[in-house]
Amino acid sequence: MRFLTAGESHGPQLTAIIEGVPAQLPLLAEDIDRELARRQGGYGRGRRMQIEKDRVQIVSGVRHGMTTGAPITFVVENKDWKNWTKIMGAEPISEEEAEKMRRKLTRPRPGHADLNGAIKYGHRDMRNVLERSSARETTVRVACGALAKVILKACGIEVAGHVREIGGIRAEETNYATIQELQKRSEESPVRCLDEDASKKMMAAIDKAKQDGDSIGGIVEVVVAGVPIGLGSHVHYDRKLDGKIAGAVMSINAFKGVEIGIGFEAARLPGSQVHDEITWSEEEGYKRKTNRLGGFEGGMTNGMPIVVKGVMKPIPTLYKPLQSVDIDSKEPFAAGVERSDSCAVPAASVVCENVVAWEVANALLDTFGSDQLPLIQAAVERHHAASKEF
């Protein structure tokens, strides 16, 4: 599968076109809307989320609740568009009109795409960069991931995410018996954290950041359970699934690091405390005693749950802005201020879930075919049985 997104933060809509989705997949708008609503939640979100109530329109590739195999188009309208029709419209306006609207951005925000994008594409108004580089685009990336989750669930694979850290406050109690328990407990927390004490401290830290006109980041974790052995490949660098997942996570706005399994901790431990011993039983087939490698060996899944962590930096838009330079006058000024969040880590955990789900679903279809769901499901079942008896 592949997808292409289009649209600006304050434009009329966001659009995604997805190609390669199997036919005979039951798909409803509510499957997508559920993930969109989760993305809009989480403690620390800004005023924009009070305006937008994201709902998807499925305008192609699905008929009577079933995919046809044709390209699928998702559209999500921006409710705030009505306030930006002149500013963000496609029709030309005069410089005088543009000046009156006072929405021209000439003071780049440190940590954002503003200045680099303006230099690259020759924009004197950095709004042309801001509007597309905004995390608002993750709305339709989540929609694509929601579709991927439907495919995975139909093949017995579940995805869940939670927050491990916000503003230096770490969750200590992160144990869970099943991925369903992880999903439930994460959803019950305003910051999607499994540790109740840490959740309260995280919310207090978010409140303080908001009061100080600042922002804070954190660490999220995504778990994928029920994965067949052998997704991805060792035969070439660009077919390694852990590499694809790492690249996808790093492509999320404001993400600056990624770990698979114990990640960087592996550099501090001897091999005997890093690699997972292999066992076999008639009931379960091949398993690992531990899962320090996060479900991957040689760029391929080993049947254990995939475990991925992503590091999100603090959002660069600050209500007490850092120093910048006006690109017109070259004089020092405080950076521009746009409506933003104090902390988007809980929402980012949902984005990360769906980005990882997309990569795993793609690998699943690469391995087991992609024409129609019943054939894929049968192939996955045969593979599970063959792996157990190997």
Curated annotation (Swiss-Prot):
Metabolic or biological pathway: Metabolic intermediate biosynthesis; chorismate biosynthesis; chorismate from D-erythrose 4-phosphate and phosphoenolpyruvate: step 7/7
Task: Give the E.C. number(s).
Answer: 4.2.3.5
The entry marks the following residues as binding NADP(+), namely 39, 45
Keywords on record: Amino-acid biosynthesis, Aromatic amino acid biosynthesis, FAD, Flavoprotein, FMN, Lyase, NADP
Q: Which PROSITE patterns match?
A: CHORISMATE_SYNTHASE_1 (PS00787), CHORISMATE_SYNTHASE_2 (PS00788), CHORISMATE_SYNTHASE_3 (PS00789)
Its UniProt entry gives the catalysed reaction(s) as: 5-O-(1-carboxyvinyl)-3-phosphoshikimate = chorismate + phosphate
Q: In the record's cofactor note, how is the cofactor described as bound?
A: Reduced FMN (FMNH(2)).
Could you name the Gene Ontology cellular component terms for this entry? cytosol
- Cofactor(s) needed for function: FMNH2
GO BP annotations, alphabetical order = amino acid biosynthetic process; aromatic amino acid family biosynthetic process; chorismate biosynthetic process
* Matching InterPro entries: Chorismate_synth (IPR000453), Chorismate_synth_AroC_sf (IPR035904), Chorismate_synthase_CS (IPR020541)
Question: Which of this chain's residues are annotated to bind FMN?
Answer: 132-134, 253-254, 298, 313-317, 339
A single GO molecular function term of this UniProt record: chorismate synthase activity
Subunit info here reads:
Homotetramer.
Protein role: This reaction introduces a second double bond into the aromatic ring system.
HAMAP family listed in its UniProt record: Chorismate_synth
UniProt record similarity statement: Belongs to the chorismate synthase family.
List the protein's name.
Chorismate synthase
Q: Which organism is it from?
A: Shouchella clausii (strain KSM-K16) (Alkalihalobacillus clausii)
